A protein has these predicted regions:
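Non-catalytic interaction/Regulatory regions outside core domains
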Residues: 2-155
Length: 155
C-alpha cells in the first residue's frame, strides 16, 4: 500500500479519543481495529479502488481518507456526498419509507461511487465512501466487500 496517501484530521483524533475504538467482529481475526485507517485499507484492497473515506454526514467532514490518486479530492467528495445522503434520508422520511438504506450508487462514465451508511446504532451518522475505476472493478463484488467491511466495524 505504499502508493496510498492517508490523512486523519487532528480534530478527528480528538473525536476518536472520545469514542470507543473500531473493532473487527469477524472470527479468526484480530479483535481490535487500531483505527479508521485499517478500515480504509480494507476498502482500498477492493479491486479497482481509487479512493476511500469514512465520513460524518452530520458535519460533512471526512474522518479519514485513503487514496491511490491525487486527482480525487476526497474531502470535497465527502462534503458533496454528505448532501446526497442527507437528501436521500430526508426523501425517505417524507415518503414514509421505513426501510434501511443499504447503499447509494453513482455511475459515471469511468467510475463508480458507492456510499454505504453505517447501519449499526452506534455508527449512525457515518458512511463509507468508495470510488472505483469502472474498467478495473467488479461492482457486485465491491458492494459485497463493502458490506462486509461495514458489518465488521463497531463504532
Amino acid at each position: 500500500m505504499s502508493g496510498f496517501r492517508f490523512h486523519l484530521r487532528p480534530t478527528v483524533r480528538r473525536w476518536m479519543a472520545q469514542r470507543p475504538a473500531l473493532r473487527r467482529t469477524t472470527p479468526n481475526r484480530e479483535k481490535d481495529m487500531p483505527n479508521i485507517e485499517t478500515g480504509l485499507k480494507d476498502m482500498m484492497s477492493i479491486e479497482g479502488a481509487l479512493g476511500a473515506a469514512v465520513v460524518d454526514y452530520g458535519s460533512g467532514m471526512a474522518l479519514g481518507t485513503l487514496s491511490a490518486t491525487s486527482s480525487l479530492d476526497l474531502n470535497v467528495a465527502a462534503a458533496g456526498n454528505t448532501e446526497v445522503v442527507r437528501a436521500k434520508m430526508r426523501t425517505m422520511d417524507q415518503l414514509g419509507i421505513n426501510e434501511t438504506l443499504e447503499d447509494i450508487l453513482i455511475t459515471l462514465s469511468n467510475q463508480y461511487h458507492v456510499i454505504r451508511p453505517l447501519t449499526d446504532r452506534k455508527g449512525q451518522g457515518l458512511f463509507l465512501y468508495l470510488a472505483l475505476d469502472r474498467s478495473r472493478s467488479n461492482l457486485a463484488l465491491a458492494r459485497h466487500r463493502l458490506k462486509g467491511i461495514e458489518e465488521a466495524l463497531e463504532v
